[in-house]
Design a protein with these regions (language model features):
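Glycine-rich, acidic/polar active-site loops that bind/position phosphate-bearing ligands
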Residues: 1-327
Length: 327
């Protein structure tokens, strides 16, 4: 997909990710608990310092394997760290994210900790996201750079069309970038900045797409369970559709999206269950084409099976809610 995008348009996707995950304590028998190694204090310096031996080990292995580590912080869930590496071509970033996850798994073995990439292991605190930071380049030119110095956050036409393409296909994209039943717990646990509305804005964390800095935007409808090869490939297809058809995303929403809706704005919600997202993907030929050959059939088979097995399960909630019901 990247090669075809370059051949047809001379453009390439550059991407960076924000791989949040939680470090959990192991039980005495070596199996993971649901207890974080730290408390849910965001950007807490002392908690970040407590993680230094673990972080240094991750950094050591990452450097040895060619990852350019640039930044890290403690996020606001138990044991939640985000350690970032530099952006690159989309296919290289996908390789790097996969390598980073394997590094964390190995460090966990060595330090008796469990690296958890489950999107929502706890309710009432932030989930594990994996925001994708996106730009499109042509040679040495970033096509997302703002053409008007007086409006430094507004991308040029190509950037706006790319955003328009993603908004058009966002429901189908969600099935790929939020690819588990558990992913949608993240969307229902409100108040923790998970996006549920198909809109875009400048520094607006209530929308699914956010222009976070001049020259790039943040795709927020994605979590820690994502397969980056599939998500970045699908984003190229969505943006290509937007560019080729000059899809207008509309003006950026600068209000809190909930305030905008109270004022009468009609905003589409993204799918709120995995089944709804999979139905949207079934009906989107552009995004389905991002998984060529037998790939989409295989993805569809296993993901619909996952959803149907969940629907056929009696949960603890069912028992607690209905066991003693007397109609």
């Amino acid at each position: 997909t990247q090669a075809a995008f370059e051949a047809d348009h001379g453009m390439r996707l550059m991407a960076g990710t924000e791989p949040e995950m939680m470090w959990l304590r192991n039980k005495e028998d070596g199996t993971p608990s649901v207890e974080g190694l730290s408390k849910p204090y965001c950007y807490h310096i002392d908690q970040f310092s407590e993680f230094q031996p673990l972080i240094h080990k991750v950094m050591e292995y990452a450097g040895a394997l060619g990852l350019d580590m640039i930044q890290g912080d403690h996020e606001d869930a138990p044991g939640q760290l985000e350690l970032n590496f530099n952006f690159d071509r989309a296919e290289i970033t996908a390789d790097n994210l996969t390598t980073y996850r394997q590094i964390c798994k190995q460090v966990g073995r060595e330090m008796n900790a469990f690296p958890c990439f489950m999107p929502k292991p706890f309710m009432g605190v932030s989930a594990n996201g994996c925001h994708h930071n996106i730009s499109i380049w042509k040679g040495d030119q970033n096509l997302f750079d703002p053409p008007d110095p007086a409006n430094p956050m507004m991308p040029g036409d190509v950037g706006k069309w790319a955003i328009g393409g993603i908004l058009k296909h966002l429901s189908a994209l969600t099935a790929i970038s939020s690819p588990t039943v558990n992913s949608y717990r993240r969307l229902w646990d409100t108040g923790f900045w998970a996006p549920v509305f198909a809109d875009w804005g400048f520094q607006n964390r209530t929308t699914a797409l956010r222009v976070s800095a001049p020259g790039r935007f943040e795709y927020r409808s994605v979590d820690s369970a994502v397969n980056p090869y599939l998500s970045l490939n699908a984003l190229i297809h969505a943006m290509r559709d937007g560019i080729e058809n000059q899809i207008d995303p509309g003006p950026p929403e600068e209000r809190n999206i909930y305030e905008a809706m109270k004022a009468g704005k009609d905003v589409k919600r993204i799918p709120m269950t995995f089944g709804e997202a999979l139905e949207a993907l079934d009906n989107d030929e552009v995004i389905k084409a991002s998984m060529p050959g037998e790939m989409y059939k295989v993805f569809r088979h296993y993901k619909w099976d996952e959803w149907e097995r969940y629907c056929a399960t009696v949960s603890d909630w069912d028992v607690e809610e209905y066991l003693d019901i007397l109609p």
